[in-house]
Every structure is written in structure tokens, then in C-alpha cells.
């Protein structure tokens, strides 16, 4: 098996499986050491999966049109960039940005699972998709995952802002001299 394929599989499997636990509040709160150690491994795995996916898209003669090639280059690059920005954020101790960028990177990495679901639904409802429909379904899957991730990110950040506003209103105002 070619090295990029091996790297893609060995990176994607732990990234997709172990990555889910990184978002579980109980693991982060009760096992912060595990979260940090697993996070370091998963950054490497995610980058390996993303970069090898980009390499295969660029250099392997895959059955794809320019549309799917564009989707793969766009979302693969976005995954690598999201993971890199998540790493930079945590190194700066910006936990909120770290969480948001890693969630985006993870959502893109989970695209294959959503692609299987959207493809299966299409087959069950309509029939086997043609090449163009198949490629649009693949792109739609990455978009679906990112929309869900953005909804979660914004929902959590808006809850935090509401709590800050309530806390600010509850504090007695001090005179400034």
C-alpha cells in the first residue's frame, strides 16, 4: 500500500475515534492530563490525515472531476489550517479559540462518515447517484458538518456572553474617583 494511503488511514482512524472524546466535558475536566496527551497525538494524526489527503488529491489519478478536486483541496486545506490555528490558540492559552478551531478541524475530518450517510440516504430515496450528484453530496457533507460545528460553537459562546452579562449586572457598581 502506498505511504500516503497508510498515513491517511493511520492518521484518520485515531483522529476520528479518539477525537470525539476530546469534546466530552467530563474527560477534559476530570482527566486534563489525558486530554493534553491525547490532544498532542491527535494534532499529529489530524495533520497527517489532512496533508496526506491533499497529497493524494493532487498526485493520484482519482475518479473525480474538477468539482470534487476543488472540494477536496478546499476542505483538506481548511482542516489542516483549523488544526494549526487550534494548536496556536492553545499555545497562547486561548481556550475558547482553541476549542472552536479544533471543532472545525474535527468536523471536516468526520466528513467521510457524513458522506456515507448522505450517499446512503440518496440511494434509498432516489437511486444510485451519477458522478456529479455524488460529488455534490460529498461537498454537502463537509458543509453539513461545518454548519453543525459552527452552531455548537456559537451556541456555547452566546451562553457564555449571557452569563457574563448577568454576572456584570449582579455586581454592585462602584464609583470611580
Feature-to-residue mapping (PLM):
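Alpha-helical membrane insertion/targeting regions
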Residues: 1-177
